[in-house]
Amino acid sequence: MASLGVNIDHIANIREARRTVEPDPVSMALLAELGGADGITVHLREDRRHIQDRDVELLRQTVRSRLNLEMASTEEMVAIALRIKPDMVTLVPERREEVTTEGGLDVAGQKASLSAMVQTLQAAGIPVSLFVDPEATQLQACKNTGACWVELHTGRYADADWSTQPQELARLQEGTAIAQQLGLRVNAGHGLTYQNVEPIAAIAGMEELNIGHTIVARSVAVGLQQAVRDMKVLVQNPRLDPLFGQAPG
């Protein structure tokens, strides 16, 4: 049964749109936990477009589930993680001009630098996950860095139409199986919604799904606690999917 990590970046996006103090991501994280979130995820970007350093500091003090810090693989971010000590760091690719993360890390192409960061963080007791596309070459490279976790990028699955989504689901199923064979633990996320999450949640070996935008969007209508509750039902009890005919796994 997969657990649910709630990404609260979009709460901070609303705040930063007016450069004001509300809504407060820290208090919203508490509501997400009250709604059943198994963890809280934030992405501290280099340009600080939404989550700010102070948010991460306060979340470390207040989160009672797990705090997953997404960040670029830079010396500045490693130093922040070593000071804050989140429950997990997820290294993600980052470009200032992107609206949101556009793809997985090229771990195979930067194995040496990523290995050094993984070793530094894990030596400090911080587990590291690498955000990658579900490709065998990248997964093997993740294993070679010494990381214990991967987060599979579900963006292509989320963006696919009905005719190609089954193939994208199959890529994620295969990627999960390969990762497990390598001894890696598997999370997934990006672009998942109430409409498409169940086939991913049903993949055998999937441990956690990190989901943000769709939960925050639904919270406008039903409140954050209820939006989290609604998503957790789907993540933990995925039904047979009519598009694919069976629960994947």
Curated annotation (Swiss-Prot):
InterPro entries for this protein: Aldolase_TIM, PyrdxlP_synth_PdxJ, Pyridoxine-5'_phos_synth
UniProt keyword list: Cytoplasm, Pyridoxine biosynthesis, Transferase
GO biological process entries: pyridoxine biosynthetic process
Assigned EC number: 2.6.99.2
Residues the entry annotates as binding 3-amino-2-oxopropyl phosphate: 7, 18, 191, 212-213
The reaction(s) this protein catalyses: 3-amino-2-oxopropyl phosphate + 1-deoxy-D-xylulose 5-phosphate = pyridoxine 5'-phosphate + phosphate + 2 H2O + H(+)
Keyword Transferase included in the entry's annotation: yes
Binding of 1-deoxy-D-xylulose 5-phosphate, residues: 9-10, 45, 50, 100
Catalytic residues identified in the record: 43 (proton acceptor), 70 (proton acceptor), 190 (proton donor)
Alphabetized GO MF terms: pyridoxine 5'-phosphate synthase activity
Protein name per UniProt: Pyridoxine 5'-phosphate synthase
Gene assigned in the entry: pdxJ
